[in-house]
């Protein structure tokens, strides 16, 4: 607990909660706070100018970060025939159909992402109550139901993140690790913000990217001045 209280004191001393920080200063602070004995993630919260109660204003999608997430991702693919061979060649960890479904039903889910070809949805559809609550159900909106399973596997392995606003209109996701170079974190953040802009609902009014905050796994949030970003 001493380490945590020491970190908490440091954060209170260093972070002005009323201030928007230059991106470089924000990243420097995050790195200073990342003193946990594990490799901390850098997380982002983006407050969107949307009415999350309206389905036509919800924002959901996926994008590949230029510098990846720093996390090794295990990918399971539901497909068959030639697509199965392509998925394996692209680096899929587990490939199957009914046999893979049986593993899932038995609670054997040693994977982080599930991809399915359209013809496999008859099998995957039966697993909704298991995969859905875990955020693993394939969905065409985020590119995990696709005829191009090999491309989807490569995206997942190369640092694709999925995003979806919560009930308060906030996007929560990860943009890398605390030991990334500052320029890598900035590039990843700008790439995410660009993807969010492209996904802006037609009916959203006023300022769209209202607030951008960065934090490490065990750290406090630091608000970023968007004017210091290339994609602002």
UniProtKB/Swiss-Prot annotation:
Cellular component terms per the entry's GO annotation: cytosolic large ribosomal subunit
Pfam families found in the cross-reference section: Ribosomal_L1
Domain of life: Bacteria
Record GO biological process: regulation of translation; translation
Gene3D superfamilies reported in the protein's UniProt record: 3.30.190.20, 3.40.50.790
Cited SUPFAM superfamilies: Ribosomal protein L1
InterPro entries reported in the protein's UniProt record: Ribosom_uL1_bac-type, Ribosomal_uL1, Ribosomal_uL1-like, Ribosomal_uL1/biogenesis, Ribosomal_uL1_3-a/b-sand, Ribosomal_uL1_CS
Keywords tagged on the record: Repressor, Ribonucleoprotein, Ribosomal protein, RNA-binding, rRNA-binding, Translation regulation, tRNA-binding
GO function terms (MF aspect): rRNA binding; structural constituent of ribosome; tRNA binding
Family assignment from sequence similarity: Belongs to the universal ribosomal protein uL1 family.
HAMAP family documented for this protein: Ribosomal_uL1_B (MF_01318_B)
NCBIfam families the record matches: rplA_bact
Role summary: Binds directly to 23S rRNA. The L1 stalk is quite mobile in the ribosome, and is involved in E site tRNA release.
Subunit relationships: Part of the 50S ribosomal subunit.
Protein name: Large ribosomal subunit protein uL1
Species per Swiss-Prot/TrEMBL record: Colwellia psychrerythraea (strain 34H / ATCC BAA-681) (Vibrio psychroerythus)
Lineage, highest ranks first: Bacteria, Pseudomonadati, Pseudomonadota, Gammaproteobacteria, Alteromonadales
The encoding gene: rplA
């Amino acid at each position: 607990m001493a380490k945590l209280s020491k970190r908490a004191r440091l954060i209170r001393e260093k972070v002005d909660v009323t201030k928007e920080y230059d991106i470089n200063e924000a990243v420097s602070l995050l790195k200073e706070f990342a003193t946990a004995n594990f490799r901390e993630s850098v997380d982002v919260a983006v407050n969107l100018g949307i009415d999350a109660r309206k389905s036509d204003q919800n924002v959901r999608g996926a994008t590949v970060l230029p510098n990846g997430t720093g996390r090794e991702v295990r990918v399971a693919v539901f497909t068959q025939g030639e697509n199965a061979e392509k998925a394996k060649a692209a680096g899929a960890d587990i490939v199957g159909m009914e046999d893979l479904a049986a593993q899932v039903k038995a609670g054997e889910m040693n994977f982080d992402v599930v991809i399915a070809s359209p013809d496999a949805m008859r099998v995957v559809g039966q697993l909704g109550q298991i995969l859905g609550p875990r955020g693993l159900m394939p969905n065409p909106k985020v590119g995990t139901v696709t005829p191009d399973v090999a491309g989807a596997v490569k995206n997942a392995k190369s640092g694709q993140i999925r995003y979806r606003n919560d009930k308060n209109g906030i996007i929560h996701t990860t943009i890398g690790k605390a030991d990334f170079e500052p320029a890598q974190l900035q590039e990843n953040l700008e790439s995410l913000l660009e993807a969010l802009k492209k996904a802006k609902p037609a009916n959203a009014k006023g300022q769209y990217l209202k607030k951008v905050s960065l934090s490490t796994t065990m750290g406090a949030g630091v608000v970023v001045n968007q004017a210091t970003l290339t994609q602002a």
